[in-house]
Amino acid sequence: EQIESMGDKVQARAIMMAAEVPVIPGTKNPIEEEDELIKAAKDIGYPLLLKAAGGGGGKGIRRVDSDEELVPAWKRTRSEALASFGDDRVYIERLVQGARHIEAQIVGDGQGSVWFLGERECSLQRNHQKVLEESPSPAVDEQLRARFRNAAVSGAAALNYRGAGTMEFLYEEDRGEFYFLEMNTRLQVEHPVTELVTGIDLVGMQLDVASGRVLEHDPDISIRGWSLEFRVCAEDPYRDFIPSTGQILGLRIPHAPFCRLDGALREGLEVTPYYDPMLAKAIVWAEDRNMASRRLSSLLSRLRIGGIHTTVPLGIELCEQDWFLAGDFDTTTLETWLQDKREGSSDPTNMEMIAAIIARHALASSLSQ
C-alpha cells in the first residue's frame, strides 16, 4: 500500500500536503482536458514540467517553455507515460530552476517511530540521472538539517511507514526553501554514503523492521566525516555519453583504507546494451570533504577497466574542479559544465587537458598492476 501510494506521484503530493510537508506548486489532479491544461499552465507560469503520475527516477518528465509547446508536449508525455508506465495520467509542476537535489534517509518501524539518518547531496546529475552523491550536503547546516528532518519524519509518519525509504526534495538555496519531490520506498543506489557517515547498516535495519523490530524514539544519530560515491558507467563521457559495449579486459580494482568499489565487475565480463549502464559504485569516506574528494580521485585514478569506455575519467576530472571542491553547484551545474566542455572541445588546450587526464589514469592503472 505504501509503495503504491508513493509510486503514484499525484497521490504522494496529496499525502504530503495533508502532512504539511511543502510541495512544489502545481496541479492537485491529473490534467484530463486541453482547456484545463491551458488554464493550469497560465496559473502556474512558464517554464513548467509535465510529469507522469506513474513516473519516477527522472523518467516521465518533459519541460515546457511556451503556449505553443504545451498541448503537443502534453499529448506526447501522456503517450510515452502509457507506453512506459501503463498509466497516461500527467500533472503539472512549476519548474524549480537552479535548485539543489537533496534527499533525506529515513527508516520507519510502522509502529509510530521514524528515524532520520541525515541528508544526501544528489545535485550532480545529467538527464535527471545522478552521477555523484555525497553525505552530508555542503549546503546544509544544523538548522536546515533540522527542517529536513521534520519534513521527512512528518511525511513518513503520515504513511505509518515501515522500512528504509528516501524523501527527495528540491532546495532553493537563495530563498532557503525546499519542496517535496518524491519518495522512494526502497534503499537507494547511494545509500552507502549514509551508512559510512552514520555507522548504521541500512540493509540490516530494513530486515529488522520487516521482522517487527520497534525503533526507539528520537535516537541520537550523529554524522561523522564525509562520504562520496561516484557511479561508474559504461559510457564515453567525451563522446556525449554514448553507450560502450564489449568485453572487460585488464581489470584492476585498487584496495585502500576507507575506499571500496561495489559492483559485479570481473575479467572477461561482456557488457551489453540491454541493461542499465552502471557497472559499479566508487565509494570513499574521510574526516572532511576535501580529504574525501582527494581519496575519490585517487581511487578512480588507480581503477582500471579496459576493453570499454567508462565514466571514470569524468569522475577524476570532477574532483579537480574548483566549483566542485567548493561545494558550489546545483542540478544545472554539471550539464552546463559538460556543454561548455563540448563547445570548447576543439580548443587545443582543452584537448590537451583531456588527454592528460586519460593518460594519468592509464599510468596510475599500469603502476597498480
PLM feature spans:
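Catalytic cores of soluble metabolic enzymes centered on carboxylation/carboxyl-transfer
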Residues: 192-369
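N-terminal beta-alpha lobe that positions the nucleotide/phosphoryl donor
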Residues: 1-167, 171-188
